[in-house]
């Protein structure tokens, strides 16, 4: 039976960032199941259109990729999401998998990065590996994307766990709670004298470059600076962290093992 591995991410239009993060994840996932042929899909229609119009590069949606795999005779397909939370983008994959499940003998789906309590614990350990050495009055602030979906609560949960465990970092979100102003007020009250800004995103794309690290007056860097807390931005996506890539590999194999147990 022909076997495939389909790695699905939101996507990025930055080629170097894609190589450092998405390709790095794909490489580790593919190495963990060498009997499968590797394929890629993006969930962002906007990024797919931009790559097609700007670069002439065609990337499939998950639905298109699965339809092509079925047409090519793949009957055992393992999908791994590279999303951070179980939000709208991941639910899009779930719906498309359910729709096309009858076309395959076996179709598995590995969950996003933050899907269980243990994932939060492991993520904090993984983040520690990429954090710079800090003075006593410094902290790292991680920028999450945020969401209108109820899964936005994952960012507040991670932030709460960090605070409760005296982990030297906080988490905010660009498009939902916790807003950066809340973090600025809280850190100022704590007497924090400097922060390091890092993306809590698979890739360091538009949000990290413009909303986090730019000299624009509304960027997180400038807002911390204006509040008297010097901010140093770091432009590296989570996909560059080997420990985080290992979490995605573990999720892939959890889904595959569960499918074996259910079939037994």
Curated annotation (Swiss-Prot):
Its EC number is 4.99.1.3. Induction: Part of the cob operon, which encodes enzymes involved in cobalamin biosynthetis. Co-sirohydrochlorin binds at residues 45, 84-85, 88-89, 92, 202-203, 207. Changing residue 211 to A: Can complement the E.coli cysG mutant in the absence of exogenous cobalt. Changing residue 145 to A: Is barely able to complement the E.coli cysG mutant in the absence of exogenous cobalt. One of its GO terms (molecular function) is cobalt ion binding. Changing residue 89 to A: Can complement the E.coli cysG mutant in the absence of exogenous cobalt. Keywords: Cobalamin biosynthesis, Cobalt, Lyase, Metal-binding, Porphyrin biosynthesis. Co(2+) binds at residues 145, 175, 207. The keyword Metal-binding applies. Homotrimer. This is Sirohydrochlorin cobaltochelatase. It comes from Salmonella typhimurium (strain LT2 / SGSC1412 / ATCC 700720).
């Amino acid at each position: 039976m022909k076997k495939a591995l389909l790695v699905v991410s939101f996507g990025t239009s930055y080629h170097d960032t894609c190589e450092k993060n998405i390709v790095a994840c794909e490489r580790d996932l593919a190495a963990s199941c060498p009997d499968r042929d590797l394929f890629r899909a993006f969930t962002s229609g906007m990024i797919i259109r931009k790559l097609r119009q700007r670069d002439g590069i065609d990337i499939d949606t998950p639905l298109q990729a699965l339809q092509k795999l079925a047409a090519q005779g793949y009957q055992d397909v393992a999908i791994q999401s590279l999303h951070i939370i179980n939000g709208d983008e991941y639910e899009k994959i779930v719906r498309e998998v359910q729709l096309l499940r009858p076309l395959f003998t076996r179709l598995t789906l590995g969950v996003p990065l933050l899907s269980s309590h243990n994932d939060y614990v492991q993520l904090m350990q993984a983040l520690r590996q990429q954090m710079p050495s800090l003075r006593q009055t410094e902290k790292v602030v991680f920028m999450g994307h945020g969401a209108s979906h109820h899964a936005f609560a994952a960012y507040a949960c991670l932030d709460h766990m960090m605070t409760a465990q005296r982990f030297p970092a906080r988490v905010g979100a660009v498009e939902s709670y916790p807003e950066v102003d809340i973090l600025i007020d809280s850190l100022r009250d704590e007497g924090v004298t400097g922060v390091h800004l890092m993306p809590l995103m698979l890739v360091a794309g538009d949000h990290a470059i413009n909303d986090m690290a730019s000299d624009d007056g509304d960027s997180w860097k400038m807002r911390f600076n204006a509040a008297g807390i010097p901010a140093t931005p770091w432009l590296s996506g989570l996909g560059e962290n080997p420990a985080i890539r290992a979490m995605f590999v573990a999720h892939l194999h959890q889904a595959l093992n569960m499918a074996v147990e259910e079939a037994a």
